[in-house]
Amino acid sequence: MTSFALNPRLEGDSVFVTDLPLSSVRLMKDANYPWLLLVPRKSDLVEIIDLDDNDQVQLMREISLASTALRNATECEKLNVGALGNQVSQLHVHVIARFRDDSAWPGPVWGVVPPKDYEPDHADRLIGDLRDALADVQ
């Protein structure tokens, strides 16, 4: 197995938030929807079933923790969670905060409107809140 490397598209479309025991947590560069990616730091993964049993359990725990942190930070009305991988095959899980008044509601977020940059102070505050919420995860 080769060493872990983050897919260049995932790296370019997101910013680092923190590392959990298994996954790197990243914030998508799209203020239309507060949106996290969890990327397990293991090489050659495409599907959740490519993880061993213990790592599958850990990933689910991290999805739950990231979902809770995002919901608390944004006070969203709904969370969308999924591992699609149609554009980027490297295993990554989307955790998206949704609001009834967002531009894509109630449909999926992909391709509805162009990505919108965060105001720097808003992104910094959100990342700080998420880091604080995820700081003590083992």
Segments predicted by a language model, with ranges:
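HIT superfamily nucleotide-processing domains
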Residues: 1-138
